[in-house]
């Protein structure tokens, strides 16, 4: 029984959680001493601290997280996304309608799965229970600041620290233990660089800060209990709880886990609760002992239910049948056989737990080949167009297959893989052989010759320059087509077998900088043709009428010869010298096709054609790429998510009626799909990590460690978290998880004025500071400094779009959805609506460029 099957059985055995099953993947816990609140599947739940059945508190498409009980136990503050922005909300302890407290800038990077983490994370309450402290980022940058807002709402006040993160007040509320750097969401365990965090103590009265940990490891999330500050640290590799004594200044290790990290602990000042391996635990500081909290709950699993989905928006590849009447399309891991015009759309795989891709029709039209990982490894499968069960063509593959291609005679399939091999498979016998392997790197753009006897490809040499080769499959001999001094790419044989067409970077047209005495080379590529045989003339040679008549006679003889003998003739000696360059402007060229008379190619995101006889270039299709059917009579055009079929050859494609993709409906079983994504991610790192020793990690054991969590994933964010934890074990930077398909609320961008405001006693809002901008730059415009606006610091905003600002406790509640929208402000020199004048501005969606610009300008003043 293979590993994939074992994992599937494990998944099947835990897919349905009943009332008595213990819940797992419970996140971001907090306690009031009798209850525990946590996030599960994006919603908040509350359960007894000693364990038991959990009660659901929130239900929303957004993610509710980082709940914190108020000191009196009556309220819960949390971070939520109810109104299209990630903000601070408040609900009663037993649940109820959320009250929005904050109105802040809408960041594009504030998802739970992003390396920056969500914005406006609730950190704690002030000990008197009057205010809630949260961490805010004014933009997508690395810096966070601590802010405080009343539980009754109003305007937030900044805590006067340069930066701040997770924090905890001393019992008397006079000091604050805090972090400065935000790395809690990075997929990078065991980090020891300059951004490793420490625990600091801030004394507002003395205006002093003290570093109490000061070591190279991560020391994060302080919890102040009596004379001790608890925190988590990876100084002994696995993240555990440590404690620092304020009086003795000694640090002691409290928990001793060696498997999963302790994650996101919090405390009410008496008890600590935390995550470990997807479960919740409580720690008694008096005894230093931890106890698991067993929690059960019921959930409708709304984000993990099976469903049927239209998948046209998830299209990844498409190819024409030889006659152009049908297409094979891959989308969301399924392979579809669809009609070019009218007919039945068939999902020929229907495997929600596997990723099928790169579907290709055989040139003889009898079979469809595709790559699938249904066995736990990527293998090539065949599906007869007559129906029946799919046939597994390859067996026991040991790495990721990149791409496949049929031989023109439909007898073989060639594929490339992550071990930098070209492998050929015989369709009849299923025998496969390694054609070659390149120790310098992968092969690119492998293509067959028309007679199936040769292949061409690109590979890098020791100098990292890409060279094009041709290779004879029978003799095993390789011959260079280009020199090693120029990057060359995208080689294809012409269909008549006479030429090799490719791109090469040989145009050196330096662009000089206007501010520095430097230059750069851009748009170096050109279209080249190699005459494969010595006796093949250049298609660009001039000719007169007599020569043309003689050539026509020769061509007629050659056509008869080609009909009986389709062999491609290549004379290797002197081949790199038999190159011509088409008279085209230097640029970026690829996706070549040629019948020997014309050359089609992609340039500037459009398909173009060059007539060799007329020496003329024409645009075939604007903004579209082309793929030609095996019979060379139809072409498929890709434009955005739309597909079009046109007759071929053509010099002008008619892209009027796109192919109907709406009938592509696939069964989605999220539990199986997420298991596949987890498995493929693990294999991607196994096969592609830059060091074979995986930084010393036991990669097989790490997979087993985190695979047990996957069946408990109830949202895509759960899966992303598990994958992030797994790849973080490699202790390397820039290992990110793309969010994938996440269902969330519609974003409503906050309008910003490029100013700092405060509320007057009368209820109106005073402009305390206007951020100067640069009028000439759209990126640096400051709305209140536009010529003719006439707004000054000290002025009051008395109304926005006719609504009095005195009627709201936070002026930004009137600016929600106003980013880059014309907005009317009523401005007065006094805190009164009487005598106010009206101005129209366009609020910003991001103030960070203004803050950065002012920082730069201030530094210039200091230095000049």
Predicted feature locations:
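PDZ/PDZ-like domain segments forming the peptide/carboxylate-binding groove
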Residues: 747-807
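A short helix->beta-strand "capping" segment at the edge of beta-propeller domains
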Residues: 21-26, 52-54, 299-315, 568-585
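A flexible loop/linker signature enriched in serine peptidases of the S9 family
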Residues: 21, 39-45, 60-64, 77-89, ...
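Terminal targeting/pro-maturation regions of precursor/exported proteins
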Residues: 655-730, 734-736, 759, 763-765, ...
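Beta-strand-rich domains and repeat architectures in extracellular enzymes and scaffolds
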Residues: 21-47, 315-333, 583-604
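Blade-terminus and WD-like Trp-Asp/Gly-His loop motifs, strongest in beta-propeller folds
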Residues: 30-33, 67-75, 123-131, 167-175, ...
